[in-house]
Structure formats: C-alpha cells, structure tokens
C-alpha cells in the first residue's frame, strides 16, 4: 500500500516503507552496482555534516530499512550494524563546522556526499541520491530522488549509516563540551542549546558561525 499524492505535496507516490523499485529499474538496464547516498546534519547549529554511500547486496538485504528519522535510536543502531555486515561496500565522509562556514551547508553536504561516493571499494554503476541535487564529481551517473530515504532501500540504508555516525560524533563532542548538551540534541537548536550559547558563547570548530542565532553576533 502506498500513500497517494493527495496525502503529500509531492507529485508521486511514496511507499509506506522504502522498497527496491528504484534499484530494480536500474538493474533491468544492466546496471549492476547501485549506490544509495544520503547525508545527516544539514540543520544543526553545531557539528559536521556527514554523508554515507551504501551499495547493498540484492540477495542479502537487511530487514526493516526505513528513513532514519522514522526509526528509534535503538533501531537505528541495530540496523547500522546489520548494514555494515550485509552491504557490499559502505563509505562515510564528513565536513566540519569550519568547512560549512567557509562554504555553505548545501555545498558542504554535496561535497560530503561526493567524498563518500569516491571512498567506496568498488566502482558503482549508478547513484541514487536523497534530495533534489546530484553532487558534482560523482564516480558514476546519478539520480536525485525527493524523499529518497522513504522510497529507496539503498538511500534509507545510507541515511541510517550517516545518522548513526553523526550521532556518535556528537556524543563525543558533548563529552568534550558539557554545557551544551550536544550528546542529547546532536547540535540542533533546542532551548537548552540556545541558552548555553547565550551563557557561554559558541565553540570554534564545533559551532557553525554562519547559522542563526550565532551569525552576526559572534566571530571566531
């Protein structure tokens, strides 16, 4: 069963859970290795943007794949381990808060996705990317899929790997910078996080100085 376009502002159907339809269309054209690419961390005030690229084994797909945002942390962690075990190849890349400030978040996210794709241990035949943009410099042709993490199991797997990787990074950042609670909110603009910035100020290398409410009020 699928949600219809009437349930969505988008002009296509979205399955209740990601499936292998997009990959099957490419496989039918003789394209063997399909890589799913997604990122985590576009919106937070702190921390890196992390991208993952995953080539799944069509004969050994993990069960329960879904958009990482629709899964509990416990389920994401379990699926993360399963993906690493069952996937043909997985690659992760990140760009720091400083790199984001030096460019912009859109360009940084696309660059992280490109770096993840070129880090794979095999040459993919086609990339499925979550969102509206195909990152420049991919090692293969690519297709951008709006809501791709809800449509494609390959992108869903990448979303889980990116999210878990970034959450673990933010847990370590939280231990190093206790006042901000980074391990709890992963750098998003919660009330506690904003209050800590007001009291203590942002941390160079951790916070994004080009993001409101930091932008224009603090300098590195």
UniProtKB/Swiss-Prot annotation:
Highest taxon above the source species: Bacteria
Cofactor binding, note field: Manganese or magnesium. Binds 1 divalent metal ion per monomer in the absence of substrate. May bind a second metal ion after substrate binding.
Domain RNase H type-2: from-to ranges: 32-220
Entries under Gene3D superfamilies matching the protein: Ribonuclease H-like superfamily/Ribonuclease H (3.30.420.10)
GO CC field: cytoplasm; ribonuclease H2 complex
GO biological process: DNA replication, removal of RNA primer; mismatch repair
Record-annotated membrane-spanning stretches: none
Disulfide bonds: none
UniProt EC number: 3.1.26.4
Coiled coil segments of this chain: none
Family membership noted in the UniProt record: Belongs to the RNase HII family.
Name assigned to this protein: Ribonuclease HII
Organism in which the protein naturally occurs: Brucella anthropi (strain ATCC 49188 / DSM 6882 / CCUG 24695 / JCM 21032 / LMG 3331 / NBRC 15819 / NCTC 12168 / Alc 37)
Gene that specifies this protein: rnhB
């Amino acid at each position: 069963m699928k949600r219809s376009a009437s349930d969505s502002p988008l002009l296509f159907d979205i399955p209740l859970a990601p499936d292998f339809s997009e990959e099957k269309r490419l496989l039918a054209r003789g394209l063997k290795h399909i890589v799913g690419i997604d990122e985590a961390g576009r919106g937070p005030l702190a921390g890196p943007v992390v991208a993952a690229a995953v080539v799944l084994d069509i004969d050994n797909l993990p069960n329960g794949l879904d958009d990482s945002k629709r899964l509990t942390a416990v389920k994401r962690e379990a699926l993360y381990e399963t993906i690493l075990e069952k996937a043909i190849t997985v690659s992760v890349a990140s760009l720091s808060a400083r790199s984001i400030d030096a460019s912009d978040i859109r360009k940084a996210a696309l660059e992280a996705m490109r770096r993840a794709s070129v880090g794979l241990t095999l040459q993919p035949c086609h990339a499925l990317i979550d969102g509206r943009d195909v990152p420049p410099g991919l090692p293969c042709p690519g297709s951008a899929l709006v809501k791709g993490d809800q449509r494609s199991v390959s992108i869903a797997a990448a979303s889980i790997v990116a999210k878990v990787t970034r959450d673990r990074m933010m847990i370590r950042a939280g231990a190093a910078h206790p006042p901000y609670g980074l391990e709890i909110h992963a750098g998003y603009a919660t009330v506690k996080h904003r209050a800590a910035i007001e009291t203590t100020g942002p941390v160079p290398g951790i916070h994004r100085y080009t993001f409101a409410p930091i932008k224009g009020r603090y300098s590195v």
